[in-house]
From Swiss-Prot:
The keyword DNA damage does not apply. Keywords: DNA-binding, Transcription, Transcription regulation. This is Putative HTH-type transcriptional regulatory protein YG5714_1269. It comes from the Archaea. GO terms for molecular function: DNA binding; DNA-binding transcription factor activity. Residues 125-180 form the HTH cro/C1-type domain. InterPro entries: Arc_TR_HTH, Cro/C1-type_HTH, Lambda_DNA-bd_dom_sf. Pfam families: HTH_3 (PF01381). The keyword Transcription applies. SMART domains: HTH_XRE. Residues 136-155 bind DNA.
Length: 310
């Protein structure tokens, strides 16, 4: 984590009086979440001076999609007015771009492997087209694109080039232009979990995932933050599960940071304990704990839940 960029990010947040928490686990390795911002919806922030890894992006995507929010990667690699879309709900911005996001300014340009596009508000496009009496064919002819392209625009399956955006503004006005981040949040799309065969059969985490899935629970595995799993039941209640590791001090740190993450993402934290010493300590601290040889109790807890906010 770049100290220079993180200080810029913190200055921006404190200037706007946002509340936030720093996630300080793992301490000496790469991690996927540096800051959780408590805005209207919790926002995850990863600060990086270089490229983020696939595993970091994977964690950010899973947490963001499961919590119906955004993950922002703040890096000097991005241009001020352009967002880079890394995955569903994961967006990379420059420190200047991050300031615009926090100030509520609209950022409508984004970059993908296919080029630079402008975000449009598909529902406004359809409403205005129908209100003004244009057929799909009329708009397609005016823009110089296919009828299928207009269908895709109106369904939100495709955005537009700079040239097409200018023509749309001429026809329908500039309120048709959207915000790359907040108009792109996806919540209903399922994030497909890795195949269980990708994990080591000797791994406790792998066995746990298998048992949870066997009981009809939806599981997402995290690799570079304080929580090990995101678990959702059929009623969409959300849990963060974290597992004790071999080092006592690191485990205590991990649990503390996972508690912060669960609080800001409105999830319930469940801790799996592997030693008797840790069990007593965690119970004294008020953590909800389960022993590794008593996973059925954890499953009963999750499947028996109802009415909790997700």
């Amino acid at each position: 984590m770049s100290k220079k960029i993180i200080n810029e990010v913190i200055d921006i947040l404190e200037d706007k009086k946002y509340t936030y928490t720093m996630i300080e686990y793992p301490e000496h390795n790469r991690k996927s979440v540096d800051i959780v911002l408590n805005s209207k919806e919790p926002t995850l922030i990863r600060v990086s001076e270089d490229k983020v890894t696939k595993e970091e992006i994977s964690d950010l995507k899973k947490i963001a999609v499961s919590t119906l929010t955004a993950s922002l990667v703040v890096t000097n690699e991005e241009e001020e007015d352009i967002v880079s879309v890394k995955a569903d709900n994961v967006f990379a911005v420059s420190p200047e771009g991050f300031k615009k996001v926090i100030n509520g300014e609209k950022i409508f340009l984004y970059r993908t492997r296919g080029g630079i596009f402008i975000k449009i508000r598909n529902y406004i496009l359809k409403h205005k087209r129908e209100e003004m009496g244009y057929s799909i064919g009329d708009v397609a002819k005016f823009l110089g694109v296919s009828r299928k392209a207009i269908y895709d625009y109106e369904k939100g399956d495709s955005d537009v080039s700079l040239e097409v955006a200018e023509k749309l503004i001429d026809l329908f006005g500039d309120d048709i232009i959207g915000d790359v981040i907040w108009d792109s949040i996806k919540g209903k799309k399922e994030v497909i979990e890795e195949d269980i065969t990708e994990f080591s059969p000797e791994s406790f985490k792998s066995k746990l995932i298998y048992k949870l899935k066997e009981n009809g629970l939806n599981i997402l595995s995290l690799k570079l933050t304080a929580a090990d799993l995101i678990v959702k039941d059929n009623e969409n209640n959300r849990y963060l599960v974290t597992i004790e590791n071999k080092d006592y001090n690191k485990s205590m740190k991990k649990f503390y940071e996972a508690k912060k993450l669960s609080s800001y993402t409105k999830s319930e934290l469940l801790i799996i304990i592997r030693t008797s010493k840790m069990l007593k300590e965690c119970e004294d601290l008020g953590y909800k704990t389960y022993e590794e040889n008593d996973i059925h109790s954890l499953i009963d807890e999750i499947k028996g839940s109802n009415g909790r906010q997700s």
